[in-house]
């Protein structure tokens, strides 16, 4: 039996805020962005999982840490809508968000909030079984803690599936054999 493609890693909420600039702020010489629209999408490992699911990879499962906040709930909805089955590890603190303020197609400012690197909770037995039955595994590390989780690393070292590792400078080295 062919198992799913399993993506493992840190997921962030990417938000693009589009607007128009018609004036400068009166108390400092910076543009004032009047928001017209915004769009949310998963970033990090979530983006890799969405790409795989929407490009015909078959069944795609994402093992990631999600905070119990509005950002985590939004990510869960976006991922499910894209056909990604989410296996969430508990994440203490807030969801990492990357907010880009844009006008006329150009980024004026990126505002990062939440999501300091934290150790996620332990994976369930279902997650460990998922990794064991995977047809392939992609680790998409964003340096925020999921790729450092000891039980996940042990499951990755034990799987017979091919494992690809997209490293991050702040993340750990790939498990031996990858």
Annotate each PLM feature.
Residues 1-22, 36-178:
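Ribokinase/PfkB-type carbohydrate-kinase core domain
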Residues 24-27:
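Flexible glycine/proline-rich, aromatic-decorated loop/lid segments
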Residues 29-36:
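Divalent-cation-assisted or electrostatically stabilized phosphate/pyrophosphate-binding catalytic cores
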């Amino acid at each position: 039996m062919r198992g799913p493609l399993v993506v493992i890693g840190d997921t962030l909420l990417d938000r693009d805020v589009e607007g128009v600039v018609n004036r400068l702020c009166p108390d400092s010489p910076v543009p004032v962005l009047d928001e017209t629209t915004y769009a949310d999408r998963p970033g990090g490992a979530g983006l890799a999982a969405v790409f795989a699911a929407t490009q015909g990879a078959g069944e795609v499962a994402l093992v990631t840490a999600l905070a119990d906040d509005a950002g985590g709930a939004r990510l869960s909805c976006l991922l499910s809508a894209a056909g990604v089955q989410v296996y969430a590890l508990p994440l203490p603190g807030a969801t990492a968000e990357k907010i880009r303020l844009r006008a006329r197609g150009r980024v004026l400012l990126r505002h990062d909030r939440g999501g300091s690197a934290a150790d996620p909770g332990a994976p369930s037995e279902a997650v460990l079984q998922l990794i064991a039955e995977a047809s392939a595994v992609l680790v998409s590390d964003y340096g925020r803690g999921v790729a450092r989780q000891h039980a996940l690393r042990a499951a990755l070292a034990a799987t017979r599936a091919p494992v690809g590792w997209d490293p991050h400078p702040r993340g750990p080295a790939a498990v031996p054999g990858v």
